[in-house]
Amino acid sequence: SINATDVKTNDAVTIKLTMDCFRSNGVTSGMVSLGGNVQTIGTKPDGSLWKVAIQNPTAEEDADFLGILETKDCAVITSGGYERYFEENGVRYHHIMDPATGKPAESDLTSVTIVSENGTLADGLSTALFVMGLDKAIAYWQAHASEFDAVLCTEDETLYVTEGIQDAFSANYPCEIIQQKGAES
């Protein structure tokens, strides 16, 4: 049997294999986008940074997005319960499972975007931080800030952006910068 988690993992693996093929064949500029998974190599051919829009999980139209991230040489991977779900008796059940309960995760986050040079890490963390919820996700980033950055979106469309990408991210909604532990406010 195949479930949504298997498909998502296959998206990340497909992108990794594609990027490995590009690199082994000398490609120095490119972008692959598959679902909520985006991976870039280098900059655009003109030398400018790639622009990756992060979808608004509560938007009724696809054209609405949380913001734009300018980037190069990294993965930008988003998880949220807004695309793969079903409704029964007025209750929405999404595909991101809480391993502690075996049920859809109850989270105060509507989406988690991870930015990392390691696409496999970003794929796993986008789901894990969604399950953790805002406070634990922030604490996790603060303990592992050298490995990834993040854009966390709450139900009220407040964005929490890690300081490592604050200058590269143009937000369309209220935004708070998450700083590393011990950093001055």
For each of these PLM feature ranges, what is it?
Residues 1-185:
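Mature catalytic core of soluble alpha/beta enzymes
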